[in-house]
Structure formats: C-alpha cells, structure tokens
Amino acid sequence: MINNRILEFREILQPLYETLKNDCNSDGKLLPFVMHWGECFAEDIPVKIMFYGRAVNGWDSTWNIDKCFDLSDPDREFNKDISGLVTCSDGWFVKHSQFWAVIKQISQAFYPDDWFKYISWSNVCKAAPSKGRNPSDRVYNKTLRTNQKILEAEIKFWSPQFVVLFTGGDWSRGGDWSKDFLCHMNDGRMPKAKFEAMWDDEYPDRKLKVYEINGVYYIVTLHPMGKKLKPHGKCIIETINKFL
C-alpha cells in the first residue's frame, strides 16, 4: 500500500528529475538514479541514517520520468524497496561491494536483524554514465544545481539524524565531492567541522569529519573502495553513538 507521505515525496521529486533530464538533454549515455530506502525507514525509528555515495557505477533506468515515478510499474525507480538490491540471489551488493560492506557493518550496529530495512541509499550525483564510472566534470557542473536541490529535498523530507557522505577525498574536483552540497545546505557557506576522527593508523590523513547543519549531523569520509573496511565502519559507528 502506498501511503500519502510517499505520494507527497513523489510530487516533490518528479519535477526536479524533469529538470535533471533537461540538464542532461536526455542523453542516453547518462541515466538517472533515484534514492532507495528500506520498508522501515519511513517509520519513526530510533536511529535514522541516510547513506550517500558519489554516483551510481553503472545503472539501468530511463529518462522517461513518468515511468520512473509510476507506482504501478514494477520496473520503476521511485519507491523501489532497497531489499531487492542487497538480498538478491547472488548477494553481489554486499559480498563484492566495499561500499555496501561498510554500510552493512554500520547498520547492523543499530539494527542487527534485517538491517537493510532501516536505511536509505542515494548519491550526490543523480545522473551518471550508464556503462559505469563517475560523471565527467562537465556533467557534474551542468547538473550540480539540480543535484543540490534533490539532495536538499531528500534530507528535508526524511529528516534523518545522520547523513553519511562517502564523498570525501576523491582524486578529482579538488579532492572532495561534499563541499558543494554542504555549502548549499548551509546557505552558501562551508560549515566548520565540529568533530574529526582518524580511522586508519597507517594513513593518519584518513579522517572523517562531522558537520552539523540545522540539527542534522553530516559525517563526511572517504569512499570505502580500496580502504580498510572494519576500522572505517567502527569509527563511523562510534561517531554516530557520540552524537546520538
């Protein structure tokens, strides 16, 4: 059953994705991504965490925005249960993705059973190459304003306590994918970090930082790929507990 809150969220997002479509000129080499969430995420749960990556690495969707948001279409992007991704038959998302391995570790610290039902997953860049890899600087800059508005809509609608941004320290765009979005959420100014923690003794520059904007704690850290997973996840868990 689709409740009124989900319909309200669709009304907010759909026109933003029409704008994103125009930003990309319906380029078939780029495809849109719409956030996913578990069935319990919409409830009043004690720890609400939204996880963000940079951009989806290969995806199968459509620029037919009506189809993306058609609640009667089983192939739609909007309101598709995240459990279909993380519990698929071969278990690829968790077994082979370092990104998802860390998300699972963090989530299970708060929800040991059916952890995937209590989280949401999105990306700061909502349009990315269909064959994989991150969007180019040209695409990033062309879609930035709309991506900022979509992220703002997602966070304002769901009102999480924590937003974990696996977007720091990338080798392109000056080393960080988070600044443009944090500034947008903070009236155009980069907020000052209120806490930071090192999570890899071998590489002391690998730190997470915490920013508070309008009562939401943004935890900015490196993308997990190619990094130590357990200490990274442990540090994020400890940080969430610190600010609960």
At which residue positions do the language-model features occur?
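A structural motif corresponding to the C-terminal end of an alpha-helix
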Residues: 105-117, 157-160, 209-217
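Glycine-centered helix-coil hinge/cap
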Residues: 38-39, 112, 167
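Structural motif
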Residues: 51, 164, 218-220
